[in-house]
Amino acid sequence: MSVAVIIDLPNGNEQRYEQVIATVFPEDKLPEGWLVHIAGPIEGGWRVVNVVPSQEEFETFANDRLRPAFEQAGEPDIVPQFTFFPVYKLIQTGTERS
Protein backbone atom coordinates (compact mmCIF):
# COMPACT_ATOMS: atom_id res chain seq x y z
CA MET A 1 0.00 0.00 0.00
CA SER A 2 1.26 3.48 -0.85
CA VAL A 3 2.18 5.86 1.94
CA ALA A 4 1.79 9.63 2.14
CA VAL A 5 4.70 11.51 3.67
CA ILE A 6 4.16 15.00 5.04
CA ILE A 7 7.43 16.85 5.50
CA ASP A 8 7.34 20.07 7.49
CA LEU A 9 10.43 22.25 7.15
CA PRO A 10 10.55 24.91 9.86
CA ASN A 11 12.33 28.01 8.51
CA GLY A 12 12.09 26.57 5.00
CA ASN A 13 11.19 28.75 2.03
CA GLU A 14 10.95 28.61 -1.75
CA GLN A 15 14.63 29.40 -2.34
CA ARG A 16 15.84 26.72 0.08
CA TYR A 17 13.35 24.22 -1.33
CA GLU A 18 14.54 24.84 -4.91
CA GLN A 19 18.17 24.39 -3.85
CA VAL A 20 17.50 20.99 -2.31
CA ILE A 21 14.98 19.77 -4.89
CA ALA A 22 17.40 20.41 -7.77
CA THR A 23 19.69 17.82 -6.20
CA VAL A 24 17.14 15.18 -5.18
CA PHE A 25 14.84 15.40 -8.23
CA PRO A 26 17.03 16.29 -11.22
CA GLU A 27 14.90 17.57 -14.10
CA ASP A 28 11.84 17.38 -11.79
CA LYS A 29 11.79 13.60 -12.24
CA LEU A 30 10.36 11.61 -9.34
CA PRO A 31 11.89 8.29 -8.29
CA GLU A 32 10.25 5.22 -9.78
CA GLY A 33 6.99 4.36 -8.06
CA TRP A 34 6.39 7.78 -6.53
CA LEU A 35 2.94 9.10 -7.38
CA VAL A 36 2.82 12.70 -6.16
CA HIS A 37 5.10 15.50 -5.00
CA ILE A 38 3.47 18.71 -3.74
CA ALA A 39 5.22 21.65 -2.07
CA GLY A 40 4.29 25.07 -0.76
CA PRO A 41 4.58 27.64 2.00
CA ILE A 42 3.04 27.27 5.45
CA GLU A 43 3.21 29.56 8.45
CA GLY A 44 6.79 29.48 9.71
CA GLY A 45 8.22 27.36 6.93
CA TRP A 46 7.57 25.04 4.01
CA ARG A 47 5.56 21.84 3.58
CA VAL A 48 6.11 18.96 1.16
CA VAL A 49 3.73 16.06 0.59
CA ASN A 50 4.79 12.94 -1.29
CA VAL A 51 2.96 9.71 -2.07
CA VAL A 52 5.52 6.91 -2.20
CA PRO A 53 5.45 3.10 -2.45
CA SER A 54 6.36 2.52 1.23
CA GLN A 55 7.66 4.21 4.36
CA GLU A 56 10.81 2.09 4.20
CA GLU A 57 11.53 3.22 0.64
CA PHE A 58 11.09 6.85 1.63
CA GLU A 59 13.33 6.46 4.67
CA THR A 60 16.06 5.02 2.44
CA PHE A 61 15.60 7.96 0.05
CA ALA A 62 15.76 10.42 2.96
CA ASN A 63 18.98 8.91 4.31
CA ASP A 64 20.70 8.43 0.94
CA ARG A 65 19.59 11.55 -0.95
CA LEU A 66 17.54 14.05 1.05
CA ARG A 67 19.73 14.55 4.12
CA PRO A 68 22.94 14.85 2.05
CA ALA A 69 21.17 17.42 -0.17
CA PHE A 70 20.31 19.55 2.88
CA GLU A 71 23.93 19.34 4.03
CA GLN A 72 25.23 20.21 0.56
CA ALA A 73 22.88 23.21 0.40
CA GLY A 74 24.26 24.44 3.73
CA GLU A 75 20.92 24.30 5.50
CA PRO A 76 21.77 23.06 9.02
CA ASP A 77 18.93 25.04 10.63
CA ILE A 78 16.26 23.14 8.68
CA VAL A 79 15.37 19.88 10.41
CA PRO A 80 12.64 18.04 8.47
CA GLN A 81 9.72 16.69 10.50
CA PHE A 82 8.16 13.60 8.89
CA THR A 83 4.59 12.32 9.28
CA PHE A 84 3.52 9.11 7.51
CA PHE A 85 0.08 7.66 6.87
CA PRO A 86 -1.24 4.88 4.62
CA VAL A 87 -3.02 6.07 1.49
CA TYR A 88 -6.51 4.68 1.35
CA LYS A 89 -7.48 6.52 -1.83
CA LEU A 90 -5.74 8.83 -4.31
CA ILE A 91 -7.74 10.50 -7.06
CA GLN A 92 -5.83 12.29 -9.81
CA THR A 93 -6.83 14.01 -13.02
CA GLY A 94 -3.52 13.34 -14.74
CA THR A 95 -2.79 17.03 -15.28
CA GLU A 96 -0.19 19.24 -13.67
CA ARG A 97 -1.56 21.90 -11.35
CA SER A 98 0.20 24.74 -9.60
Question: Residues of each region from the PLM?
Answer:
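Short S/T/G/P-rich N-terminal loop/turn motif that feeds into the first structured element of a domain
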Residues: 1-49, 53-68, 75-98
